Amino acid sequence: KDIKLQADLDSEKIIHEILTNAFSYPILSEESYKISDEEKKGIYWIVDPLDGSLNFSQNIPLCCISIALYENNKPLSGVIYDFNRDEMFSGIVGVGAWLNDKKIIPSDNIKDKSQAILATGFSSYMNYDKDGLMEFISNIQEFKKIRLLGSAALSLAYVACGRIDAYYEKDIAIWDVAAGIAILESLGNITYSFFQNELKCLIRVENKLKEKNDIRAN
């Protein structure tokens, strides 16, 4: 199961106060705040106050804060802040994406999967029986190298800026990936498939890879 820390709650409280003082939009957050389907038809925030809680608890510097703005289940903008490296990844759909104050320019380099680096993870919701594991392996085995960062948000940020070539994870919560999806959408030419069913999501992202394959929802 996901680890929950006092730091998650403290971060969430601060973010909630800042957002509610500045805006009237409802907030969907991992720890405490849920919204209705009707509210999701309008503009709303999706917040993960501390993505990579286990890393944080073990002093592994792969964790971040993730905040996204959505309207009718579609991304408008997103911010991922890596407080260990003081790196702010941000994106506005239709405008562009940035790493701190530098605009992210997607690479034109097209790679075969056999030469690409994939980030992935083992979700708390994932089916770990034989069939579930075989499906997982079938989706990652073509890649040259596999990395498990322990933070879905940072994994997507790294795809956006070209540090990693692709990301795949099944049965992951929307707040883990919402800001990353917004940043990818802001870049425009990164292919991703995203399917949402309540709190469980299936996401695959590829940055300039050959032989792209869509993953269809079951």
PLM regions: where:
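N-terminal subdomain of lithium-sensitive/metallo-dependent phosphomonoesterases centered on the IMPase/IPPase/PAP
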Residues: K1-L50
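Residue-level signal for inorganic ion chemistry
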Residues: D8, L19, S53, D82, ...
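Generic detector of well-ordered alpha-helical packing
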Residues: L9, E31, P49-G52, F83, ...
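Solvent-exposed alpha-helices and their adjacent loops that cap or buttress functional pockets
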Residues: D37-E39, S90, N109-K113
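DPxDG-like acidic metal-binding loop motif
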Residues: E39-W98
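Short, isolated positions in well-ordered beta-strands
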Residues: L76, I104-S107
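A structural micro-motif at secondary-structure boundaries
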Residues: L99-K103
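An extended, acidic
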Residues: P106-N218
